A protein has these predicted regions:
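Positively charged n-region of N-terminal signal peptides that target proteins for export
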Residues: 1-4
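Hydrophobic h-region of N-terminal signal peptides that target proteins for export
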Residues: 8-17
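Short, flexible helical or helix-coil boundary motifs
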Residues: 12, 187-190, 471
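Carbohydrate-recognition beta-sandwich/jelly-roll modules
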Residues: 19-268, 285-287, 299, 303-306, ...
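Short beta-alpha junction loops
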Residues: 73, 313-315, 427
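Active-site-proximal substrate-binding groove within the catalytic cores of carbohydrate-active enzymes
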Residues: 131, 141, 146-179, 223-239, ...
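Aromatic-lined carbohydrate-binding/catalytic grooves of carbohydrate-active enzymes
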Residues: 212-363, 371-379, 384-395
Length: 610
């Protein structure tokens, strides 16, 4: 124990500032037998001002279940302040008791922070970042908020040091925007990501996307989203549109004056949407076959559009058949069993191993798709929607970090062929390879349950990544301008249909109608995205398309500030000085900078506005 104390205890440099509560703390090790060890720690002061807590890989006990990293500042008495998490959730520091625990594998960013009247700090997990959760416990009005590393869930030996850097924030940066900017600046300085402005240079496909709305159209899908269907039986297929129908839809979009649209064909492949991936061919005759698909792609390009498709590299089904289905190639759990993902439209899905994806079929798939004439950024389902899954297959083992590296290799290959990579949810282990997130938010989705300590969301991810990754806020704000209906959304949140999905309405009342959903897109700097509707009318899409035109350049700009100006009124300020103010009130206008923001309305303040 004395040796361990020496390893983890550090000396603070003379430049350290006293009184932040970040200089000292402790590391707590929970062992699988129930024993726990508390080790006092003095943080190392880094050149960038961070207070660093480190536990070397060699000093992480292999019998540990958890390791907590807890500075003194992690203990906060109930006060007028708030906490935030890397999945955008926040809560006021006004409770007497309660517990919040992030779900492992669904924290978009490895950051967390606290703001009180006395201090503001942000923590960034820089080592073993794929293996921790956030733990927030409140008892007798005292909060304890810290990262917990789940050592027993790694499935391999710990593969890197635990490193957590804490930054004290002051002045105009002493808020959640400052927390997100601190994280963004660190990512930019280390070259982890590059601004979108730089990446579009010499990349016409990505440049097109940056000025286009995203329109996804589903032609067909399997109807096997049920445990009642035998695990490996071919489910029935619902045919919705042919390629001839799709051509007519694109013509209607063009006729309405929507010139900048990223067209993405969904459900085009063998057995339709969520059919037996990774098998893509033959293109179903019911849709018109491959020649009709090539014709539709060529027609869309003749209208001036960029054309892309939806695929899935994350899931594999037995129904894909030989030679794609080979049990030696599937992701394997620690017990040696094939990892099942769950029941999707195509039936029971298994996890792929991305080493196999890269080495077996990705290159040939991309080559075939390119030969069909596709020229838009490529959309790949799931990959950035969850953390990487470890694999214990003897021929292709990988821990989470190694699997993330293989995922990034797929991004590199896709970018080399199509200019950009699109996926969903924005888990930022994929940030270096991600160009577009179909949605970001976890509120009301499968990823995060409700908790008594959560009061809402703030655009933490958007502040960190707007100007780097294109996005729109939530699953619920896809088709924002369309009336989707409460019943349809509630049906998807029925736990009997999909384990883990929780009621959206409790925390997202304001997102149930087109007006509120559209305001959320503008508030969060979103790129309008359309997918779940049948496009029986294009008027709502056209309305949102037109509204976005004066603001669409903001996809290139960093967000520097986000504020609550009044009840139900919020302001977003970009680095170029431009602002958007949204008013969620049903009946109260709000005056700002010489303009009146109408109830359920917004105002854009471009450069030169008084």
């Amino acid at each position: 124990m004395k040796r361990l104390l020496m390893v983890v205890a550090f000396v603070v440099s003379a430049a350290a500032t006293a009184g932040t509560g970040l200089e000292k703390g402790f590391i707590r090790i929970w062992r699988e037998n129930g024993q726990k060890t508390r080790i006092p720690v003095t943080a190392e002061r880094m050149r960038d001002g961070a207070y660093r807590y480190r536990l070397a890989t060699k000093d992480i006990p292999r019998t540990a279940e958890f390791v907590d990293v807890v500075p003194e500042a992690a203990e906060v008495k109930k006060c007028d302040g708030y906490w935030v998490a890397g999945d955008n959730r926040y809560g006021r520091l006004d409770r007497d008791k309660g517990h919040f625990r992030s779900v492992c594998g669904h924290l978009q960013m490895p950051i967390f922070g606290v703001k009180t009247s006395e201090r503001c700090w942000v923590g960034i997990v820089k080592g073993l970042r794929l293996e921790f959760i956030l733990n927030l416990a409140v008892a007798d009005g005292v909060y304890h908020y810290y990262p917990r590393f789940e050592i027993s869930r790694i499935e391999f030996d710990p593969y890197e040091d635990i490193v957590v850097d804490y930054y004290e924030l002051a002045g105009d940066d002493a808020n959640y925007a400052g927390m997100a900017k601190t994280y963004r600046d660190w990512n930019l300085k280390r070259g982890w990501v590059k601004p979108l402005k730089e990446r579009v240079k010499g990349n016409p496909a990505l440049e097109w996307s940056a000025k286009s709305v995203f329109m996804r159209c589903k032609l067909s899908h399997c109807d096997g989203h049920s445990r009642d269907n035998p695990a490996h039986a071919m489910p029935p297929i619902l045919w919705k549109r042919t390629f001839a129908d799709y051509k007519k839809l694109m013509k209607s979009v063009k006729d309405l004056g929507m010139d900048y649209v990223d067209m993405c064909i969904v459900g085009w492949q063998y057995m339709g949407f969520d059919g037996p991936f990774p098998k893509l061919w033959p293109v179903p005759d019911e849709l018109g076959g491959e020649e009709a698909m090539k014709d539709a792609i060529a027609y869309g390009k003749s209208l001036g559009y960029r054309m892309s498709v939806h695929v899935n590299n994350h899931n594999i089904y037995r129904n894909c058949g030989a030679p794609l289905w080979n049990e030696d190639d599937i992701c394997v759990n620690k017990k040696g069993h094939l990892r099942t993902y769950g029941y999707l439209q195509g039936g029971l899905a298994y996890h792929t191993c991305f080493q196999v994806v890269n080495n077996r079929w990705l290159d040939s798939d991309l080559r075939h798709l390119k030969e069909m004439g596709l020229n838009g950024i490529h959309h790949v389902d799931v990959t950035s929607a969850r953390y990487p899954t470890p694999c214990h297959a003897p021929n292709h083992p990988a821990n989470r970090r190694e699997m993330a590296e293989w995922q990034l290799k797929t991004c590199e290959k896709v970018r080399a062929v199509f200019g950009g990579y699109s996926s969903e949810a924005g888990m930022d282990h994929l940030a270096p390879g991600l160009d577009n997130a179909l949605y970001v938010g976890t509120f009301g989705s499968a990823q995060q349950p409700a908790t008594e300590l959560v009061d809402g969301e703030v655009p933490l991810w958007q502040i960190a990544y707007n100007g780097i990754i294109m996005s729109q806020p939530y699953w619920a704000t896809v088709d924002a301008s369309y009336g989707r209906g409460k019943d349809k959304l509630k049906k998807l949140s029925d736990p009997k249909r999909r384990k883990g999905i929780h009621e959206m309405k409790e925390m997202n009342d304001y997102l149930w109608d087109p007006a509120h959903r559209t305001l959320k897109v503008w508030e969060y700097g979103g790129r309008p995205t359309f997918y779940f509707n049948d496009y029986a009318t294009l008027a709502p899409m056209k309305e949102m398309y037109d509204a976005w035109q004066p603001m669409k350049h903001l996809v290139y700009e960093f967000i520097d500030r986000h504020d609550r100006l009044a009840e139900n009124v919020y302001r977003t300020r970009w680095a170029n000085g431009e602002e958007v103010v949204v008013n969620y009130s049903d009946d109260r206008p709000y005056d700002y900078r010489g303009r009146t923001v109408a109830p359920l309305g917004y105002e854009f303040y471009p450069k030169g506005t008084n």
